[in-house]
Amino acid sequence: MLARKAYRDLRAMGLRAVLIVAVIGAGPGTAAGISLALHDVEHTRDAFYSRYRLANLDLRLRRPLAAGPLLRRAQAAGAQRAETRLILDGAALYGGAQTSAEAVGMPVAAPLNRLAVTAGRGLARGAARGVVLDTDYADRFGIGVGDRLRLRLAGRTIALRVRGLARSPEYLLATANPDYLVPQRGSLAVAFLPRSSLQRLTGLRGRADDLAVDLPGGGQGPRARRLEAGLPTERVTPRSRQYGLRLTEADVHSFSIFAPVMGLVFGIVGLLLIALSLRRLVSSQRRELGALLAIGYPPRTVVASVLLPAAALGALGAALAAAVTIGVGRLVADEYSSAVGFPAVRYPLAVGPLALAAGLALAATLLAAALPAYRLARLDPIEALRGERVGSFELPGWLQRLTAVGPPALTYGLRGLLRRPLLSAATVVSIAGAIGLAAALNILVSSTNSAVDAEFAGQGWTHSADLARPLPDARAAALTRRAGAARAEATVKGPAELNAAGGGRTGIQLAGLPRRPALLRLDLTSGSGPAPGRIVLSAQTARRLGVSLGDHLSLRTSAGRTAVTAGGIARTLAGEQSYLPRRRASRLLGLPGRATTVLVAGDARVAGRLRADPAVARVTSKASALTAERELLDELTGLISVLQAISLGVGALFLVSTLALSYLDRRGEFATLAALGYGRRQIGAAVAGEALSQTLVAAALSIPLGVLIASPLSQRIAEAWFEIGLHPEPPSFLLVILPALALALLAAAHATRRALQLNIAATVRARLIG
């Protein structure tokens, strides 16, 4: 009996059942789809790193040393795998363009950091001048297999032929300036050569300046410190601080909040619409359920007779939610991977997000149906048999006067909203949530642009020159004078480790600044600049260690250990850097009176002279870093646009569903209006007035809601990447509100067309469900 009743109820619902299933599946499916996309991106990245053996620790030295002792040192430290490489900074010359380059001399059969060849062939011992190029650089300049290019290394120019293109786990998202967590795709020409070939071409036979290892327990801890001790280290990079890994972790950490936020927004409004729809269904069966109670059926049977059709709707909605999860997940994962230059995304079927989407859809449906059914089952059978009380639709006098502001059709539409406050409120909340979420994404993009522009605008340098080896301050100053720089500022940088009193530990890049830096200006959010015994931390490092101003820290470098106090916290895109006075930093790094980097203020000619100087390894410009940031944001805007389209699509579904449910409830009224002579224009005005009124109220509500949604998102971005603040601007909202109004008019036109197709006589006589 219950099964027959459920089947009959579903058939009677018709279009309403389809709309309820769509609403059930859309919200949870969209939220779970973003979770699935994050899972796919992480799985793709981790699978790539695992397959091509990304080392868990990399030591870059300031000068080449004999390779044999380095390998023996790694074995003594307990390394499971180890390889030495020769990595030289220089410039790639191709088609009149000069690009910062790293020549990587590596074993042909490398145990670590293997190459994933995407075109052509890999390295070969017999091809001494056959180079394998990083794919991003080759794509940027249109270089193909068989082309020729030149590398300028340590004053020598070497002619090479491109043997193949590849991606490396170490150089995934390679960038010329890794200080900033903004990838400049193609800005660094990574050229892979057989190690013996590069050693021979540069006169450094048997030498290496890079040691990559896999240590038990990862790349941090006592073994790593023992391996590093006494070496002239320029950079220490454990796997967790590898550039590509840090960037994707920051993105995944930032985007991971979208899933719960979208799930919360769509879940609330979806539950409202589901609850209202099923409440109408239960109320329409009041007499029928009362009869079951009167003839002796227990209340649990009455509740079951309602839950059974609801469960059928929920099961269909759960299946739709799973399908939406897969579709949204793959769409977002592909957009993200395209934006950051990842390899092709792999799609393992993650059960978690699918089960979450289906479970939420089914649970929301059953909960929405159980509450009105439970209330009805507690009624006295005689009271239930009397049917639903006829409510009065008469509005208070002041509301009647307020709504009588236009033609009768518009008045009818406005009063229709007020006569059904629950349905109208649910619609307004759902549309406001969809608009607010899309606007919040716009706010984040504009705020990020503003914050990064402000960060670079506050700096006085135009170019940064990394030196091939540390130079005395006087020689570094002479180098910039020869280049014709208007102003120059020498700095010293090197790897260090900070330990907090609470046990926190992190690797940093220690930078030494002049007493009054003119070119590198710190944007201090609290405290003061570097001073003896007082270190300035980036906001990211302070959060990672959980320290605040005045906290005591232990600073360890290859030259020793010292105690420092957190004297300032700076907002910076160079999240790995911490700052001390230059003299103190140079002593701690074992480089007293020397510089490793020179910041200059000058034009492109100055940069060209610096690039041509053999003492300079690499030159990067502030303008190129800013351009790269804008390009990245432009590409990520494509991902944001996908999320906005999804948000607006779900909002449009809610709007269309609400108008359709309202239309189904009021077919008799529309038929009566048509019988009284109302035509397309009058009925269309009534429906459009109702739809636009709801959308305009929702648009007004979406403004504070958008800021409210953007706030935790910006905080999450600050934790992972960079403190951007919030800069809400009118375009962020108008770009979403205007399409929402257009969608409202389209939905109203559809409802009007259906109203005009009604059979007037049959509709007026019919007994409608709900």
For each of these PLM feature ranges, what is it?
Residues 378-395, 756-770:
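Short cytosolic juxtamembrane segments of multi-pass membrane proteins
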Residues 1-4, 237, 395-411:
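Short, membrane-interfacial amphipathic segments enriched in basic
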Residues 14-40, 311, 319, 422-447:
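Short, strongly hydrophobic transmembrane alpha-helices
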Residues 490-491, 595-601, 609-715, 719-726, ...:
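C-terminal transmembrane helical bundles of large multi-pass transporters
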Residues 270-278, 285-287, 311-342, 352-378, ...:
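Small-residue-rich transmembrane alpha-helices
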Residues 50-66, 407-532, 536-540, 548-551, ...:
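Juxtamembrane segments of multi-pass membrane proteins
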Residues 13, 248, 272-312, 653-696:
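Interfacial "coupling" helices/loops that link adjacent transmembrane helices in transporter permeases
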Residues 2-268, 280-283, 299-300, 330, ...:
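Membrane transport/envelope proteins' first extracytoplasmic loop
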